[in-house]
Regions:
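Structured, active/binding-site neighborhoods that engage oxygen-rich ligands
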Residues: 1-307
């Protein structure tokens, strides 16, 4: 849902914030790999790939994931550079543990939520499988940390009731899950280019909730870099944890990597509120709506089976 909303604004360098959102509904997006209103992008496509890998194997099997990525590539929509290059190597026969790019892009983070759903009661397995899920395309430690962060956030929110989400507690849980994964700080992409870690940037989020969205998202810079997009998605969610529509619209209208940030923000809202949290007016035109709901139900049943 988030990527379908945000795709027309992806790459926009002129963020627009409420109260009158320029993007308030699905829009047809023209050009390369354009689609009708409600069309999903690689964010949802790859989340489906991971979910189906988990359902088939009962765990994250990286060899199976690699095969599925190869099948996905020709029909991938809005593919990221690192993911594309890595899957091209997989297609050429390079093993999954050697194919990944040394990239801290968000291609692993945006597809990791199903691991949080399956392993919500098993922190160690969650962390290990989220790291494994990143490696076929992203071997950078920050990319792995981003995948663990999104899986851990999903798992933590599944244990909360709507109306009870405490932002500082969520951030603390994510930080605990990713501690030790980042070998060294990495630079911000915008001046002053300070060195920092995802762990530390996430720690800034509770205080940032006191500021206006345009200030915060200008500071976080919601691009495709894990250091930008994962905190931005969490911010959009935490600003309106019980109103998924507002989270999605904030992320979609912020431009830059709008589809991925909105997709991740929506994932978090869904983990907290379930199907009831989905904006009902956006469901009818959402591509693969029934398949996505069924897949989520199947994965939850699998999670209950494995305990």
């Amino acid at each position: 849902m988030g990527d379908a909303l945000g795709r027309p604004a992806e790459g926009s360098r002129t963020p627009r914030f409420g109260p009158a959102w320029p993007i308030s509904d699905y829009q047809r997006w023209p050009g390369y790999q354009g689609g009708r209103v409600g069309t999903i992008t690689d964010d949802t496509q790859l989340t489906i790939v991971v979910a189906e890998c988990l359902l088939t194997n009962g765990c994250l099997d990286p060899e199976d994931l690699a095969r599925r990525l190869v099948v996905w590539l020709p029909d991938g929509r809005g593919k990221g550079v690192a993911t594309t290059q890595a899957v091209q190597r997989l297609t050429a026969g390079i093993p999954w543990y050697l194919a990944g790019e040394d990239s801290a892009g968000n291609g692993a983070a945006m597809r990791a939520a199903p691991i949080g759903l399956l392993r919500h009661a098993h922190t160690g397995q969650l962390r290990a499988e989220a790291v494994l899920s990143a490696l076929p395309t992203h071997r950078n430690p920050m990319a792995a940390a981003g995948a663990v962060a999104m899986a851990a956030a999903t798992a933590w929110l599944l244990g909360c009731q709507p109306g009870t989400c405490v932002s500082s507690a969520l951030v603390t849980a994510i930080q605990a899950a990713i501690v030790g994964l980042e070998k060294e700080p990495q630079p911000e992409r915008r001046p002053p280019g300070r060195l920092t870690t995802l762990h530390d940037r996430l720690g800034e989020l509770p205080a940032l909730l006191e500021q206006q969205p345009e200030q915060v998202l200008s500071y976080l810079y919601n691009g495709a870099y894990v250091l930008e997009s994962v905190p931005a998605a969490l911010y959009c969610f935490m600003r309106s944890p019980d109103d998924m529509e507002q989270s999605l619209l904030l992320a979609a209208n912020a431009g830059y990597d709008a589809d991925s940030v909105a997709a991740m923000a929506g994932t978090l809202g869904g983990a907290l509120g379930g199907e009831a949290a989905l904006p009902q007016r956006l469901l009818p035109e959402l591509e693969y709506r029934e398949e996505l709901l069924a897949l989520a139900d199947d994965l939850w049943q699998k999670a209950l089976e494995v305990g």
